[in-house]
Amino acid sequence: MTRSITIARRELGSYFCSPIAYVVMAVFLLTCGFLFWDDFQPGQIAAMRNLFDWMVWMLVWTIPVISMGLLAQEFATGTIETLMTVPLNETDVVLGKFLGSFGFFTVLLAPTLLYVVVLALFSVPGIDLGPIASGYLGIILVAGLFISIGLFCSSLTRSQVVAAVAAVAVLFTVTIAPWWISGKIESDFWLNVCNQTVFKRYTDFSRGVIDTGNLVFFICSTAVFLFLTVKVLESRRWK
């Protein structure tokens, strides 16, 4: 685990040397700020549910950008061979890359806590921290899953652009497509499919409901994609 943390620190530091990271941060925070301000009404009941729901859609486009170079860049520059010659195994590399990207996302998300302070100061009759805390937990779980998917896509190619496009396609398929289809096709099958999607499972968190089944879903799904990424790296080692 120590070796993974070392890689994570290196990865996190590399984000702040990239102009793309600052562009992503600016766009994400400006969009969140606009959505919060548009929904905020002083003197009304404090709520961040609408902002949290919009964040999920934003992550479909944001996460692929911050995860596209996690492994694809290493393959393109040839540094993956150097990385794998030191006493590291594939699991160390994958966990380190994941934790580094996840760490950057927490930095990206942290400024939005200012909105909680604003709600606490100006909302009536006060602020209920339960739904807000569960909403943040849900966003963190969704981001973890999306980063693991982005990391997996990055392990399949040497091109960062291809990795980003592939990640967007996968995230669109598991998040937006079922929701859109369920609104167009009225059938029990698509209704059941929609109930199992990422967005549907996340909405429980945004309403203040922490369901064990949803926790298991996000954690296990993230673990599956990390496992698949490890297997891809192992297969590349023997080529």
Question: What does each model-identified segment do?
Answer:
Residues 1-21:
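Aromatic- and glycine-rich beta-strand/loop motifs that create alpha-glucan
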Residues 11, 114-121, 148-152, 172, ...:
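Alpha-helical transmembrane segments of multipass membrane proteins
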Residues 32-37, 43-46, 58, 100-162, ...:
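Secretory targeting signals
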Residues 40-45, 163-232, 239:
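Terminal transmembrane helical anchor/hairpin motif
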Residues 51-73:
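Long, hydrophobic alpha-helical segments
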Residues 63-67, 115, 148-149, 198, ...:
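Hydrophobic/aromatic residues in alpha-helical transmembrane segments
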Residues 70-100:
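Helix-loop-helix units of permease transmembrane domains in multi-pass membrane transporters
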